[in-house]
Amino acid sequence: LNALRRFFQIEAHGSSFRREILAGLTTFTTMSYIIVVNPAILKSAGIPAGPSMTATVLAAVCGCLMMGLYANRPFAIAPYMGENAFIAFTVCLGLGIRWQTALGAIFIAGVAFIALTILRLRQKLVESIPTSLRYSFAVGIGLFLTFVGLNQTGMVELGVAGAPVKAGALTTAPVLVAIFGFLLIGALVIRKIPGAILIGIVVTALVVFATHVAPWPKAVFGMPASVAPIFGQMDLRGALSLKALPVALTIFIMAFVDTMGTLIGLSARAGFLDENGNLPQIERPMMVDAIATVLSPLFGTTTSGAFVESATGIEAGGRTGLTAVVVAICFALSAFAAPFVSAIPAQAYGPALIIVGLFMLAPITRIDFTDYTESIPAFAVVSLMCFTYNIAVGITAGFLLYPFCKVVQGKAHEVKAGLWALAALSLLFFIFYPYK
């Protein structure tokens, strides 16, 4: 244990061995849904569900291990939710592109990430982002998580004509159990009980099973499916065709801004940013993200990156890479316990996402709302992330609005060259983004 403490510098980060383990368990619990949801989405693209689940686990295990052992950060890596839906429903079903070609486009984007990271260009781009935008990423992700939690628990539903959303059936058993989970976690947080989020998830899950809101797991263990049918099946030649190149560009920009916003947002909440709002040694988590993006299509799944649900582990006290390693171990074990892991219902982990959304609002006090050239772009980031249900749209809007506001004010010289480059990429993002 002493060797682990020294390797991860646990005491230097103001943490403890027990806290890191608890944080890893908490993070895994809130993101374990990806094991089931990712294959379910990619099945629409033609990727078989069994091998896809194994590929999801492999991508998560490799990404989390690299993040923990190399970057020493408590950020969990797994296939992104937004990108998998983009590939399945827009690229494959909408544009008629084969899933093998789509995976080839993801691989190309990953190689570009690695090149930019080695050349330190990704780091320079990040450092060109104003602090107001960086903190708005954390706030926006927080509201995004809150909205996800409200929707998954049934507290908020798709609205009728004239109203985009509406209150769910708040008196039904599933929603009542979720409300119980929210109140329980809130009470535990107020009382400053260690492991409040994880305790809340476990207790709420037991209540869900006991009240028959969701069925008890039919089995606990089972052998994972072989990944052979989809391993290494990406089509690089097809990905370089004129039809697929816009897809590769869109994937590149989506993954770039998603990862950038998530890393900075999580780092702001964890207290990792320095006095200038920069993340020290940011090239390490960025390199992990780039390598994970290359490995994912090799395994047979879509873009991987830092998960916003890592915020739950950070709130539980996770501050080192040991948290990510624990998440990796949990994912590895989950390959043999998929029936049990998949049984954890949204009513159990949804309330945790809502509470974490509250926690992530803290950086909003560091945004200067008296300077409209700072507050208008920040407001756009936060509102668009939440109301478009798309993190990338919010971030890219901020990249475009900040230079615009400074130019209008006559202070274009305050905009760094890197931000102009990000604005250009953001413009391409909106041009090529598939809106249907």
Where are these regions (language model features)?
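Residue-level signature of catalytic and energy-coupling elements of molecular machines
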Residues: 21, 41, 125, 195, ...
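Loop-to-helix transition at the N-terminal end of transmembrane alpha-helices
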Residues: 46-65
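Helix-loop-helix hairpins and the membrane-proximal interhelical loops
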Residues: 1-51, 164-168, 198-283, 426-428, ...
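Helix-loop-helix junctions within the multi-pass membrane cores of secondary transporters/permeases
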Residues: 2-38, 59, 80-89, 93-138, ...
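Conserved active-site and cofactor/substrate-binding residues in soluble primary-metabolism enzymes
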Residues: 16, 32, 36, 53, ...
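Membrane-helix interface/capping residues of multi-pass secondary transporters
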Residues: 49-50, 75, 99, 391
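Membrane-embedded alpha-helical modules
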Residues: 95-206, 210, 325-436
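Transmembrane alpha-helix interface/packing and boundary motifs in multi-pass membrane proteins
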Residues: 63-76, 186-192, 251-258, 289-299, ...
